[in-house]
Each structure stands twice: as structure tokens, then as C-alpha cells.
């Protein structure tokens, strides 16, 4: 059972099946690495803290010890996952026809919402179903309008978010409390997660062959 005191994300492993060959450079993973380096080396990226503040130091040390213990336990339980010789990633993963990496601009201040625009175009092109998972529904008017257009196409459209009882982001949960009627007015079928922990996964399923 997940720790109820922590948020739980959705992580996906991508494996470059062409690694070590002449086609390795075509993998989308290189684009992800380039994006990371672009953000890391940007002139506006600065070190925030060299060490934990005094009033956080004890909790940071306790969490560090817990992570080390969890890692040691995991290594003992699954040694095969750390062995390059015995790990068959092709067997452990599912082949994909194509993978596209999209991201917003990294400039400071206001940014063009490129990621949302592209996701919205994909949703509006759905023919069978759209399932959107997000921790919180904090929208501006253009996003409300976009969700309404998706729902208005008549394709089953579901949105899964944290209920206000399990959401661990006070500001985001407060926004949903204030604007819940606006979210429902988009026409999407809204599912509120009432689990024992806060879900922080972000995913999008379109028809039977596209995920984001």
C-alpha cells in the first residue's frame, strides 16, 4: 500500500532498443537529454540551496536515511534489475510505433502553452474515447473552452482528479473547490479520486493507440 503521507506519481520507462547501433541517435531519449541539458545550463537556472536550512535539517536527514534503507531493501529483493547482463529490456517493455517529445518554452515569465495546445489538438481528434488523469484542475478560460470543445464532440470524455479530501496541494484543491461547477460545465465526466493517498500522475489516453 503506498505511503499516505506522500504524493504518488506515474513513471514510465523508455528503452532505446537501437542503443549501440547506427540508428541509436534516432531515439527520442536523446531529445529528452538535450532538453535537460538546455534547462540545466540556462542562464536563469541557479542553485537554490547548498544545504538544507537548519529548521529542516533533521527531517531531511531522516528522509535521506529512509531512502537509503528503501534502496538497500530494493537491491536485495530485486538484484536482477541492477544487472546489465541479466536485464532484458526488450522482454520487459512494450514496443511503440512512435514516441514524440513535446515541451513548453523555457524562457522566464509568461510562456506560450504549447504542450496544452498540442494535447488539446490530440483530444479533439479522438474517435473513441478520451481519458485525462491530472492531480488538479486549475484552468484558465482558454482551457475551459478547450475542454468544452472536446466534450462537445460526443466522444466519451472522462477526467480523473484528486478529491479535495486527498489532494495535498492546498492552493490547487482550493481552486477546484471554488471552480468545480465550471469544470463540470465543460461536459466532461469527472471522477474524483478518494484513495488512501494523493495521486500525482498526469496521463492522457486517446482511443486505443495513443497515450501521453
Write out the residue ranges for each language-model feature.
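Charged, low-complexity intrinsically disordered terminal segments
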Residues: 1-212
Amino acid at each position: 500500500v503506498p505511503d499516505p503521507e506522500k504524493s504518488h506519481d506515474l513513471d514510465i520507462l523508455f528503452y532505446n532498443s537501437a542503443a549501440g547501433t547506427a540508428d541509436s541517435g534516432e531515439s527520442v531519449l536523446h531529445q529528452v537529454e538535450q532538453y535537460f541539458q538546455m534547462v540545466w545550463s540556462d542562464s536563469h537556472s541557479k542553485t537554490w540551496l547548498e544545504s538544507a536550512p537548519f529548521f529542516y535539517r533533521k527531517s531531511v536527514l531522516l528522509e535521506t536515511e529512509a531512502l537509503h534503507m528503501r534502496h538497500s531493501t530494493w537491491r536485495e529483493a530485486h538484484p536482477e534489475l541492477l544487472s546489465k547482463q541479466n536485464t532484458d529490456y526488450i522482454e520487459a517493455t512494450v514496443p511503440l510505433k512512435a514516441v514524440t517529445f513535446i515541451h513548453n518554452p523555457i524562457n522566464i515569465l509568461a510562456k506560450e502553452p504549447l504542450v496544452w495546445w498540442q494535447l488539446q489538438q490530440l483530444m479533439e481528434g479522438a474517435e473513441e474515447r478520451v481519458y485525462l488523469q491530472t492531480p488538479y484542475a486549475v484552468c484558465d478560460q482558454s482551457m475551459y473552452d478547450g475542454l468544452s470543445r472536446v466534450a462537445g464532440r460526443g466522444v466519451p470524455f472522462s477526467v480523473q482528479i484528486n478529491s479535495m479530501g486527498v489532494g495535498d496541494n492546498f492552493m490547487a484543491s482550493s481552486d477546484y473547490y471554488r471552480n468545480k461547477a465550471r469544470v463540470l460545465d465543460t461536459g466532461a465526466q469527472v471522477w474524483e479520486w478518494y484513495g488512501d493517498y494523493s495521486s500525482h500522475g498526469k496521463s492522457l489516453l486517446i482511443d486505443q493507440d495513443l497515450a501521453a
